[in-house]
């Protein structure tokens, strides 16, 4: 009888606690209850899975337009759990800069990233992150980046040469044909990060069967089934997964392990080269080894991180910028004129390629592509202690959504043409010079590289890569879309790409 009584008391207390946590606290007690709320969620799970809806970030861009707010919108998840969508420069500045120590990436997100891209700078938090970034910054100074332009240009030129080999020669010196830039973008970005990052020649452009490219294509595949593999690999014990009849997971795991093996070999090679004492090679890995501050395993994890970030992110933007240029013949012509005037064909090897940083339209095109198509369209943070955002109390454990795709396309921040590719927004009409704000009133309107202590350490590296690829391709070919009606909606869980690819008709120029 006593056991039965305790049982029913437990049931009643559990029901009361559940009612308080699910119904009473979120909507009647929580300090977040006064924030603007979205009513568009699913009847059962509300917005719990909003960050996975394709195109990623599009829903949040719509909510930003539809819900009046002062910088924060409260989205509800399972059982009414709050998730705060940051919508203004002021709220973003608080979370990313002013109170950055009060926020971290979600533990689950860090665990997934650690499994996929390594336990390096991207997954580090707190003092560990500070120390890692302090040591790495020396390899990303402007002089270091400028010294890499010849490396980038060599790979960008190799791209144009390999594309030309796939075209048809008409007998008059002109090559024409059709190609898909979605095929070439990951290959040129892989060869660039290989050479400039690790001193390795991957030859991904020349080798259609490049093993490292195939590993990455499969490890970062598009589709819900692949995403399930990532979650399972992160959340379930390996011993359980090994017993399951799940070939897709085994293939995913094999690709991740192969990438780690590649990184292990590159670090081994780089340490052997450095030990010869013939000077420090001009690449990121050699610089890290030269400091003497990294263990062998730490080097492997940082290489995994830079390989993923330097390859996937750049590859994504290359696809989108080629799509934008192929869609606008006038912009393409203007850019070509600028390049021809500043990069003469004769004795190009003797030109200081850092001049690319001074070309207004080239930099405008690159910045606009990064703005409109951020390689990381959405991110998460969680409050690790009670804090405030815009003077509003935030309880410990509150998750936040940071959505570059939505902020970068906000008409309130970027004007009525925020959704349109407009490179001229980055050029001052009175002087014709490049500006670094694109007409936005706050630098927090541009979120592609985030801000604060956790901003992207490789943003100038990525811009240099993009300048050289765009310059090399536009100097070499005239491009038009093969099918202007193709579906160019962004798809993908990690770095979005056009759904139907970027198929272009090419005509050689040089």
UniProtKB/Swiss-Prot annotation:
One of its GO terms (biological process) is mycotoxin biosynthetic process. Glycans are attached at residues 313, 408, 443. This is Cytochrome P450 monooxygenase ptmK. GO terms for cellular component: membrane. The gene is ptmK. Its cofactor is heme. Its EC number is 1.-.-.-. Keywords: Glycoprotein, Heme, Iron, Membrane, Metal-binding, Monooxygenase, Oxidoreductase, Transmembrane, Transmembrane helix. Belongs to the cytochrome P450 family. Pathway: Secondary metabolite biosynthesis. It comes from Penicillium ochrochloron. The chain crosses the membrane at residues 2-22.
């Amino acid at each position: 009888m006593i056991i039965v009584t305790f049982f029913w008391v437990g049931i009643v207390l559990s029901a009361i606690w559940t009612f308080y946590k699910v119904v009473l606290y979120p909507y009647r007690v929580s300090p977040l209850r006064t924030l603007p709320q979205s009513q568009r969620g699913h009847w059962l799970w509300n917005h719990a899975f909003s960050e996975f809806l394709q195109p990623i970030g599009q829903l949040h861009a719509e909510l930003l337009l539809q819900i009046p707010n002062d910088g924060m919108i409260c989205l509800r998840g399972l059982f009414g759990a709050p998730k705060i969508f940051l919508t203004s420069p002021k709220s973003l500045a608080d979370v990313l800069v002013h109170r950055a120590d009060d926020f971290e990436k979600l533990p689950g997100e860090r665990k997934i990233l650690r499994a996929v891209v390594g336990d390096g700078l991207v997954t580090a938090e707190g003092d560990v992150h500070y120390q890692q970034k302090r040591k790495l910054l020396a390899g990303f100074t402007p002089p270091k980046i400028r010294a890499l332009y010849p490396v980038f240009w060599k790979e960008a030129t190799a791209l144009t040469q390999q594309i030309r080999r796939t075209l048809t020669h008409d007998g008059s010196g002109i090559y024409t044909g059709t190609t898909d830039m979605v095929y070439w973008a990951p290959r040129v970005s892989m060869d660039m990060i290989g050479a400039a990052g690790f001193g390795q020649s991957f030859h991904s452009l020349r080798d259609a069967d490049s093993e490292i490219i195939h590993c990455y294509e499969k490890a970062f595949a598009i589709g819900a089934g692949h995403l399930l593999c990532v979650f399972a690999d992160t959340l379930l014990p390996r011993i359980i997964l090994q017993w399951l009849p799940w070939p897709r997971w085994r293939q995913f795991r094999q690709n991740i392990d192969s990438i780690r093996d590649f990184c292990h070999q590159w670090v081994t090679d780089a340490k052997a080269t450095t030990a010869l004492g013939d000077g420090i090679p001009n690449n990121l890995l050699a610089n890290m080894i030269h400091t003497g501050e990294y263990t062998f395993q730490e080097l492997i994890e940082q290489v995994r991180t830079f390989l993923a970030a330097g390859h996937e992110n750049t590859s994504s933007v290359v696809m989108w910028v080629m799509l934008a240029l192929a869609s606008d013949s006038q912009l393409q012509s203007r850019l070509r004129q600028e390049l021809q005037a500043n990069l003469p064909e004769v004795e190009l090897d003797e030109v200081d390629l850092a001049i690319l940083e001074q070309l207004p339209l080239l930099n405008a095109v690159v910045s606009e592509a990064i703005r409109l198509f951020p390689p990381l369209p959405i991110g998460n943070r969680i409050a690790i202690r009670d804090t405030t955002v815009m003077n509003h109390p935030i309880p410990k454990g509150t998750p936040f959504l940071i959505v570059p795709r939505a902020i970068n396309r906000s008409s309130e921040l970027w004007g009525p043409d925020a959704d349109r590719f407009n490179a001229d927004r980055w050029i001052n009409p009175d002087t014709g010079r490049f500006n670094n704000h694109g007409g936005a009133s706050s630098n927090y309107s541009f979120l592609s590289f985030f801000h604060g202590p956790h901003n992207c350490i490789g943003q100038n590296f990525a811009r240099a890569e993009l300048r050289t690829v765009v310059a090399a391709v536009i100097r070499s070919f005239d491009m038009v879309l093969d099918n202007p009606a193709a579906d160019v909606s962004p798809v993908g869980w990690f770095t979005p790409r056009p759904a139907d690819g970027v198929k272009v008709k090419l005509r050689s120029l040089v």
